[in-house]
Amino acid sequence: FLILEDGNVFTGTSIGSTREVISEIVFNTSMAGYLEVLTDPSYAGQAVCMTYPLIGNYGICRDDCESERPWPDGFIVRELSRIPSNFRCDCTIQEYLEENGVPGIAGIDTRALTKILREKGTMNGMITTNEAYDLNEVLPKLKEYTTGKVVEKVTCREKYVVAPTTELAQNGPLSGLSLI
């Protein structure tokens, strides 16, 4: 279930981790790049609703990550592709969410959710698999929730060097490229 602080409840299928999470609910309109969204530190403290209807079709390619781990507290999709089609794929999005403890929900009307968020602004919500939730207990928790100190959460503790990961980059300087 996805429960919003305004009382709206969406019923879907659990994806990723089955842990319960309260988070700020936001949406992203990208047609591709869900891995970049998942690994973008600017989404820390938020659960991201992807507006494009099919997510996961090219799987997870770890070389394409923006950072070493996913940052959103939750992930919301209309339809999750369970069989990726990509020769570079390391794992499915389901496996990636599970191994990183990120809960999510699939099978909900993400257009309706996006319309609510667009009209009312971002709001807090809960992703839960608890069928016996009590709305009268959940809503006050949602209204009280704050994202906390997300800058501290995403900031590196020590500097580090990022080494080239592709064969092309390891063979020396790239020619014929313009940097803007």
What residue ranges belong to the model's regions?
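RNA-binding accessory domains that recognize and position tRNA/RNA substrates
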Residues: 1-180
